[in-house]
């Protein structure tokens, strides 16, 4: 059953866990990003000036760029959260409900085919307490069910089942607590990519001249 939280005043709350409390998703790595009514303050994200760490004339690179945690987090925000990242291949999803789990940066991702045949990608994190809703590497399913408190999500990412529903606040609306979806998912020659940026340029435009090399390699086989 869903265990209520004990607040500082001794009262109990069964509120779902917010996106910010679960994981730093790619979309939330961007300064000022919002999910629902939440907004991560810009001040929490430290920017590092990296220009002085590289001397292009001498070809010298400060070794700190390989180990500094602040630079790594900045790369997650500025690069990985706004880039097209490879997720899977279309051949892995022949039937509705086929799924594959992978990563976008440090974010666990579920890639699946919905009942209309569309490839979708979701953050693999329950909106209640942040636990994984899919622990298998791949397979086929009708719903993704969190093993912590039993919340179940369908292939469209909608919250379709909540055990002990009467224990939740009256204002709790399951329609507001579906899985966080990767907003941009596109494919090229069977290769599926995702992007946390809903306004990102198209995958084809982003590939640019690299598409020629992909064509030369993938067109050798009619199946890609």
Spans of features found by a protein language model:
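Glycine-rich active-site/cofactor-binding loop and its immediate structural neighborhood
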Residues: 98-147
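Rieske [2Fe-2S] iron-sulfur-binding subdomain
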Residues: 3, 7-118, 152-224
């Amino acid at each position: 059953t869903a265990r209520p939280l004990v607040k500082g005043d001794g009262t109990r709350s069964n509120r779902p866990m917010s996106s910010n409390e679960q994981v730093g998703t790619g979309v939330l790595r961007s300064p000022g990003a919002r999910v629902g009514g939440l907004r991560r303050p810009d001040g929490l994200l430290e920017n590092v000036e990296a220009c002085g760490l590289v001397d292009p004339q001498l070809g010298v690179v400060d070794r700190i760029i390989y180990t500094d945690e602040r630079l790594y987090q900045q790369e997650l925000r500025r690069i990985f959260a706004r880039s097209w990242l490879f997720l899977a291949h279309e051949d892995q999803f022949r039937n509705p409900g086929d799924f594959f789990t992978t990563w976008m940066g440090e974010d666990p991702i579920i890639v699946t085919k919905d009942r209309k045949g569309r490839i979708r990608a979701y953050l693999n994190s329950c909106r209640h307490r942040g636990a994984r809703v899919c622990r298998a590497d791949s397979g086929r399913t009708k719903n993704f069910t969190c093993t912590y408190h039993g919340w179940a999500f369908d292939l469209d990412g909608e919250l379709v089942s909540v055990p002990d529903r009467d224990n939740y606040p009256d204002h709790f609306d399951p329609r507001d607590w579906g899985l966080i979806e990767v907003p941009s998912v596109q494919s090229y020659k069977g290769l599926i990519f995702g992007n946390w940026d809903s306004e990102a340029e198209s995958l084809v435009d982003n590939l640019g001249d690299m598409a020629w090399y992909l064509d030369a390699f993938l067109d050798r086989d009619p199946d890609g």
